[in-house]
């Protein structure tokens, strides 16, 4: 089952969401501030992060989001907040958040957002793999040293028979 990191300064949120996700079979880890959340994400490389926007400390939610997006471009991050407005949701989305949940959270809302985010991650990974396959195929067929040698030999034969 996918692994999830919950980063929130409210122990109740971490406990309740963690219990919900554990019951659904997710491997759940948590952190209570931005710095430890970023560190846990970097060491554990979760499949998804639920991140509170307004966490205290040197790294707030937006700073953690930016850091995670730089290090793990395909990692889906869902932002959560009880006090943020539309401007914060737009900013988080521009920085790469895949969803923005308002507190108080509902089990249905969390599970739906997570399912969508995990599907997006799978699609991104498949796209990356397909692009790599296409690049390799182009390289093998059209740009390989063997093809360059073959083209040179054909050109040489063509000049010899003219």
Predicted ranges, named:
Residues 44-50, 55:
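Active-site beta3 strand of CheY-like receiver
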Residues 8, 52-53, 81:
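Active-site residues of response regulator receiver
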Residues 25-35, 39-40:
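Short hydrophobic/Thr-rich beta-strand motif most characteristic of the beta2 strand and flanking loop
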Residues 11-29:
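Two-component/phosphorelay signaling modules centered on CheY-like receiver
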Residues 85-87, 101, 105-114:
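C-terminal output helix
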Residues 39, 54, 59-74, 91:
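Short amphipathic alpha-helix used as the core "switch/output" element in two-component signaling
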Residues 131-161:
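AAA+ ATPase active-site-proximal loops
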């Amino acid at each position: 089952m996918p692994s999830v990191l919950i980063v929130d300064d409210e122990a109740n949120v971490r406990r309740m969401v963690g219990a919900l996700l554990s019951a659904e079979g997710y491997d759940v880890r948590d952190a209570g501030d931005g710095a430890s959340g970023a560190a846990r994400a970097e060491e554990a490389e979760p499949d998804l992060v639920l991140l509170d926007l307004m966490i205290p400390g040197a790294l707030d939610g937006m700073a953690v989001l930016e850091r995670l997006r730089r290090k793990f471009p395909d990692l889906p991050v869902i932002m959560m907040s009880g006090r943020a407005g539309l401007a914060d949701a737009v900013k988080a989305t521009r920085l790469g958040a895949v969803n923005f949940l308002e507190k108080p959270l509902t089990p249905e809302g969390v599970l739906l957002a997570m399912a969508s985010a995990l599907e997006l991650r799978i699609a991104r990974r498949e796209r990356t793999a397909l692009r790599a396959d296409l690049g390799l195929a182009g390289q093998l067929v059209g740009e390989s040293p063997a093809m360059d040698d073959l083209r040179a030999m054909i050109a040489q034969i063509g000049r010899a028979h003219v």
